[in-house]
UniProtKB/Swiss-Prot annotation:
Extracellular face of the membrane: 76-88, 153-174, 230-256
Any one GO cellular component localisation term in the record: plasma membrane
Record protein name field: Aquaporin PIP1-1
Pfam families: MIP
Amino acid sequence: MEGKEEDVRLGANKFSERQPIGTAAQSDKGYKEPPPAPLFEPGELTSWSFYRAGIAEFMATFLFLYITILTVMGVVKSNSKCSTVGIQGIAWAFGGMIFALVYCTAGISGGHINPAVTFGLFLARKLSLTRALFYMVMQCLGAICGAGVVKGYQKGLYESNGGGANVVAPGYTKGDGLGAEIVGTFILVYTVFSATDAKRNARDSHVPILAPLPIGFAVFLVHLATIPITGTGINPARSLGAAIIYNKKHAWDDHWIFWVGPFIGAALAAIYHQIVIRAIPFKSRP
């Protein structure tokens, strides 16, 4: 037992087979922050992995919109709450799809599936501006296509039931909607930072495998809280795809909220995690 305790205390770098589950493979003292991503990285444009990651973001956002908008349509068209999955079912559809899609794409693109997540990670210098812009474009295109497929074979149902577009609900002000989007996106992006934290991943080897679970659960909980207010955006691509395909005036009246709110929330989450939680600007540099 004394030998094992000594191995763990030293980081167990040389005795990985004796390391208890969940203990550090690398001590905090020996941990080094990964270098920030360059602002511009033109070399990415000649790499197949760059385009493969963009395609993964497109497909993930396409599938996300397809499943979630179908779920929303099924709930909205029902005359009885007892005959449908209700708000809880919608929240599970959004959270469950994020869980599945992050798990599928994390090793290829990072599993963003959301321009707000991409924006937050860019502010934290986790990826280059080149990649961030490419991801956002592919996410928006995927969302448009996903909503378009739903409308393509259920046009009447789609147009008569709001098309899954995000709007501020009657009884709430634009400020209420903006606040809900800021806080909801903050929760999501803060969870993403925590679940993918490089230092935590180095310390606990099981953390990267579990990362999709808290991210999906955060999406689920935010939807439970804010569906009655805005229909829950917290994802500008999701809001844009539904608005473009539905394309009715009221879908555009409050659309700015679903870009400004998530981007503010993502920026606040990035600042909070990097400066307050990780204190990266205050760490001494050699």
